[in-house]
Curated annotation (Swiss-Prot):
Organism from which the protein derives: Bacillus cereus (strain ATCC 14579 / DSM 31 / CCUG 7414 / JCM 2152 / NBRC 15305 / NCIMB 9373 / NCTC 2599 / NRRL B-3711)
Annotated function: May play some important role in either sporulation or the dormant spore.
Protein's name in the database: Protein SspF
A single MF term (Gene Ontology): double-stranded DNA binding
GO terms under biological process: DNA topological change; sporulation resulting in formation of a cellular spore
Residues with site note (Cleavage): E15, L16
Keyword field: DNA-binding, Sporulation
Origin: domain of life: Bacteria
Similarity section: Belongs to the alpha/beta-type SASP family.
A Pfam family matched in the record: SASP
Length: 59
């Protein structure tokens, strides 16, 4: 089975990790090294950004 292509680009994920304060872990251990809580916070923030962009488009 092939892996599903990620929805978020690596650049966007790195920006979110920097914003949320765990980019150092990503650099040292890769994405597998982050805590589940950090991954959840990253997804939550990505959703917030997407919602803001949709609201701007609909105005």
């Amino acid at each position: 089975m092939s892996r599903r292509r990620g929805v978020m680009s690596n650049q966007f994920k790195e920006e979110l990790a920097k914003e949320l304060g765990f980019y150092d872990v990503v650099q040292k251990e890769g994405w597998g090294g982050i805590r589940a809580k950090d991954a959840g916070n990253m997804v939550k923030r990505a959703i917030e950004i997407a919602e803001q962009q949709l609201m701007k488009r609909n105005q």
